[in-house]
Amino acid sequence: MESVITATIIGASILLAFAALGTAIGFAILGGKFLESSARQPELASSLQTKMFIVAGLLDAIAMIAVGISLLFIFANPFIDLLK
């Protein structure tokens, strides 16, 4: 039983790490492309900024969903019932 709990904690940690890494890479690419496009066409900066914030919110949702799934696996582990 301890091995299932240990594997669950390791899996949840890996899930959170990859979600944070993906979100950070996504924000870096998004910010770089926004600055590049704003420098290329300054008259579109306001509409691009609105779209950038929408995509930034969706990128944040990835990390929040990963936290929710990790908490589900840690506190309500469905795999422990298989051992009984």
From Swiss-Prot:
GO cellular component: plasma membrane; proton-transporting ATP synthase complex; proton-transporting two-sector ATPase complex, proton-transporting domain
Matches recorded under Pfam families: ATP-synt_C (PF00137)
Subcellular location: Cell inner membrane
SUPFAM superfamilies tied to this protein: F1F0 ATP synthase subunit C
Keywords from the UniProt entry: ATP synthesis, Cell inner membrane, Cell membrane, CF(0), Hydrogen ion transport, Ion transport, Lipid-binding, Membrane, Transmembrane, Transmembrane helix, Transport
Membrane-spanning parts: 9-29, 54-74
Gene Ontology MF terms in the entry: lipid binding; proton-transporting ATP synthase activity, rotational mechanism
Topology class, membrane: Multi-pass membrane protein
Entry's family note: Belongs to the ATPase C chain family.
Function recorded in the entry: F(1)F(0) ATP synthase produces ATP from ADP in the presence of a proton or sodium gradient. F-type ATPases consist of two structural domains, F(1) containing the extramembraneous catalytic core and F(0) containing the membrane proton channel, linked together by a central stalk and a peripheral stalk. During catalysis, ATP synthesis in the catalytic domain of F(1) is coupled via a rotary mechanism of the central stalk subunits to proton translocation.
Protein name: ATP synthase subunit c
Gene source species: Actinobacillus pleuropneumoniae serotype 5b (strain L20)
Organismal lineage: Bacteria, Pseudomonadati, Pseudomonadota, Gammaproteobacteria, Pasteurellales
Gene: atpE
